[in-house]
Amino acid sequence: MGTNKPVVIGIAGGSGSGKTSVTKAIFDHFKGHSILILEQDYYYKDQSHLPMEERLKTNYDHPLAFDNDLLIEHLQQLLAYEQIDKPVYDYTLHTRSEEIIPVEPKDVIILEGILILEDPRLCELMDIKLFVDTDADLRILRRMQRDIKERGRTMDSVIDQYVTVVRPMHNQFIEPSKKFADIIIPEGGQNHVAIDIMVTKIATILEQKVNL
């Protein structure tokens, strides 16, 4: 473990942009090394105090849906090489689960999420900020496939949510946050050149830590 603080790489982008694929490609390349993924999706606010009818109204694409205070606290703990207990979100109950996931600190932290660049406090903790930029048509197709297959949603409900919530929130919050990125990656996980560049950069960081 290095003596300096860990390096934080932020990977943002709209839902279905391919940011998770970019994150996984980078992480898989460094399996066995000192690297971890911290997903903003795990940090939706606890809503156990609300009745189910209120939880069902949750706008998961709005900045206020996230417990960024807890995310920042956990990120600061990891930067101090302290273990955290990552929360788990239950999408069937629309609230935080009682389950937690212990996460050990690593030398490289990949922070991934749709709105991580929207919060200046999170941006201040990142060393490298990436935005995965993908065509809107491809993003909605990917989101439909994910929500129908993994979350038991109907096609009509996914389309309705996209038109009334996802697209407006993307245009209002996610797209404008792109200006805070150091690097914009078009074509998401298919952009192997950009991924290779990031792999090379991270390899250099890890090598420097080993030589400290």
Swiss-Prot record:
Keywords tagged on the record: ATP-binding, Cytoplasm, Kinase, Nucleotide-binding, Transferase
Assigned EC number: 2.7.1.48
Main location: cytoplasm
GO cellular component terms, semicolon-separated: cytoplasm
One Pfam entry name: PRK
BP terms from Gene Ontology: CTP salvage; UMP salvage
Superkingdom of source: Bacteria
Subcellular location: Cytoplasm
GO terms for MF: ATP binding; cytidine kinase activity; uridine kinase activity
Residues binding ATP: G13, G14, S15, G16, S17, G18, K19, T20
HAMAP family the record matches: Uridine_kinase
Family in the record: Belongs to the uridine kinase family.
Protein name per UniProt: Uridine kinase
